[in-house]
Amino acid sequence: MNGTEGPYFYIPMLNTTGIVRSPYEYPQYYLVNPAAYAALCAYMFLLILLGFPINFLTLYVTIEHKKLRTPLNYILLNLAVANLFMVFGGFTTTMYTSMHGYFVLGRLGCNLEGFFATLGGEIGLWSLVVLAVERWMVVCKPISNFRFTENHAIMGLGFTWFAASACAVPPLVGWSRYIPEGMQCSCGVDYYTRAEGFNNESFVVYMFVCHFLIPLIVVFFCYGRLLCAVKEAAAAQQESETTQRAEREVTRMVVIMVIAFLICWCPYAGVAWYIFSNQGSEFGPLFMTIPAFFAKSSSIYNPLIYIFMNKQFRHCMITTLCCGKNPFEEEEGSTTTSKTEASSASSSSVSPA
């Protein structure tokens, strides 16, 4: 083993020199330069500085404007709530611990940070899955005359919380565990050890299959079918410039969604799986730290993609920020009108939300 395993921690450094110390009790500056901890603290501060106002604004604007309180936007709000969970439950904790150079909050703090970060990330992930299924059901109409109602939205919300809890709760009750990872300033699922009594192997396999591969397959299937539906609608009206424009816009939106999904989760999942399947191999603390915190940046670009590309929401947001007046109202209105005309073949559901 090319690391040091202790009670409720694993440090990616052999203790041949005797300098390895518990990440709950001592600064870990022997792992990386102290400047790296300062950089991590600054990065977390940036995520808080950007993530909180973006997601809070999403909630505030939706509450203020009644026309935004639609069933589909319930899921978008759920995404914002999930991101706020990550901001308050994960980012603030990591910023504080990185200031000290170790997980100063102890074992209980590690459990709480790992739980809230995992819960927020999983709620966000499954919210994207529900959005993908909704787009597929409405646009492609596998069930004729299907209409996404408030009851469907509530069921979708319940499903996201159930699925997220099914991933975040088990490490708290003995199926796997949360331990400090990377630079030892944040906590995640134990991919690193085969500690007796925790069944880490079975939980990691369950987590990858049920909470990564299945969501990925569903998202690809739904958006793949959505692209086909848009192309078919455009082919039926080849002389309509607005339809062709709608096809290009939706194609661009879907490509951005899928790429963001992959960029957010694949590096972290790939590194975690490598560590799990090559336990005992040599790797540095930054090997897991960089993809883990890159995945956490989804709290910023998720709302930008899934909400700010929504013309109606953007109009309401600008109106709120400009004290009741949208200086771009005419442009926004004409764009929305053309979008509605272009998407008539699919009941105006081709355009983003």
Curated annotation (Swiss-Prot):
Q: Tell me if Lipoprotein is a UniProt keyword of this record.
A: yes
**Which domain of life does this protein belong to?**
Eukaryota
Lipid anchor positions (S-palmitoyl cysteine): C322, C323
Q: Where is the composition biased (Low complexity)?
A: 334-353
Task: Kindly list the cysteine pairs connected by disulfide bridges.
Answer: C110-C187
InterPro entries from the UniProt entry: GPCR_opsins, GPCR_Rhodpsn, GPCR_Rhodpsn_7TM, Opsin, Retinal_BS, Rhodopsin, Rhodopsin_N
* Primary localization class, coarse: membrane
The protein's name is: Rhodopsin
Name the gene that codes for it.
rho
